[in-house]
Amino acid sequence: RESFDNLGANATFFIVSKIIKLLGNNIINDIKNNYHIGCHSYQHLNLSRLSEKDFDLDTDRAKKILEDIFQKEILYYRAPYFSAEKITNFFYKILSKHSFQYSSSIRLSNTPKSIITNEYNIHEIPLKSFGIGTKKYTIIGGTYFRVTPLSLIIKLLKNAAKNNFIPMVYLHNYDFDPFAKKLKFINLKGKINNEIRYYGRKSVFDKLKGISNEFEFTSLDDFVNE
């Protein structure tokens, strides 16, 4: 929180509701009183593996928990792993059913405008991405943010803004903590993923400070309602 204050930064917190139940009241109240809140599902499952019914149940449960805890209507949604891209046949229908108004769950290489309204009257705020083989390099957050040099991050964000995207940074709580103990894995894949997840954490706040010299940090809700 102190680091965000030093940057003069506001943000949208997309929250996994199963996790928020485990946090103390002080943290919950700090988020409630200082940041815009969105829904990031109930338990952060890959949505492409869920049926329409399962996604419906997960979304209903997640939204009710967040609205009960924060005592406010939750109108924004972000899909875990950007996995809504594979279930667009029912994704927006379910969001509309549960009275969401905004989503930031889709990655596009090009967009005609920064906010796209679909047939269910859900306003999608896409992130810019480009392909590298079978992978999508998303601008910009998580591992991409930690391993990419600041100068390139700023260049990518400016390019996104130039091409009708809202220049967004997305980060997880673990991206900020260089002092957290590493998890122990037996298999090689787990060990490699663990090392990747810790790489570059110490650079995050310096990069955010550098970005703040070029852009003003704000929440999605404040940006939409400017």
Describe every region a protein language model picked out.
Residues 1-76, 81-133, 149-226:
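Catalytic alpha-helical scaffold of carbohydrate-active enzymes acting on polysaccharides/glycoconjugates
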Residues 48, 137-147:
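Surface-exposed cleft-lining segments at the edges of enzyme active sites
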